[in-house]
A protein has these predicted regions:
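Substrate-binding pocket helix/loop in short-chain dehydrogenase/reductase
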Residues: 1-16, 57, 67, 110, ...
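A glycine/serine/threonine-rich, flexible loop-to-helix segment
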Residues: 56-61, 91, 98-127
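A conserved structural motif in NAD(P)-dependent oxidoreductases
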Residues: 127-138, 149
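Short C-terminal tail/terminal secondary-structure segment
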Residues: 142-143, 154-167
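A short, exposed helix-loop element centered on a Lys and neighboring polar residues
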Residues: 27-28, 83
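Catalytic loop of short-chain dehydrogenase/reductase
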Residues: 5-11, 35, 44-77, 82-91, ...
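Short, small/polar-rich loop/turn modules that mediate ligand/substrate recognition or access, typified
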Residues: 90-95, 153-155
């Protein structure tokens, strides 16, 4: 973990390399292949509400969870990278947009464990819709961005976070 209380520089660099640099190179490679082959279309990237807002330590009170500064840095970078890509690749009729996803109930990355009950209570109290999102609430936005219905949308963030980022 890389928190403001405790950071391991090697872990920090590894996270940036895996979760930011690979993201950039893969997305750029795809866009370059589309450009080279004269393929127009839509690239849909994924980010997190923590790319828009800082993590709130109050959500983690009385849990074994803590903020992760590296995560926020990476996610805010991916949001801006989407805008940079959209600006450059637009002239090739390649649209680049981002889904900015908030808390989704039921999973902890890389684990079969359920989310901490105290964290869920804290999160649900804060978010305007008073609940976490459901995984089935994401695909319709992907379908929209991939379709011709969004043909004049590029460089945008569709925020799916129950209103968390507005407060």
């Amino acid at each position: 973990k890389n928190t403001f209380k405790e950071i391991n520089f090697d872990s920090y660099k590894k996270n940036i390399e895996i979760h930011l640099n690979s993201y950039v190179w893969i997305a750029k490679s795809i866009a370059d292949q589309m450009k080279k082959n004269n393929i127009s279309g839509s690239i849909i990237q994924l980010s997190s509400m923590y790319g828009l807002v800082a993590q709130d330590d109050n959500l983690y009170k009385n849990t074994n969870i803590s903020e992760n500064m590296t995560y926020g840095i990476i996610k805010s970078s991916t949001i801006h990278f989407t805008k940079q890509m959209a600006s450059y690749y637009g002239k090739y009729n390649i649209r680049v947009n981002n889904l900015v996803i908030g808390g989704i109930k039921g999973h902890i990355k890389g684990s079969k464990k359920k989310q901490d009950k105290i964290f869920l209570k804290n999160f649900n109290f804060k978010v305007p819709l008073k609940r976490m999102g459901k995984s089935q609430e994401i695909p319709s936005s992907v379908i929209f961005l991939a379709s011709s219905a969004s043909s004049y949308i590029t460089g945008s963030n569709i925020v799916i976070d129950g209103g968390y980022s507005i407060i």
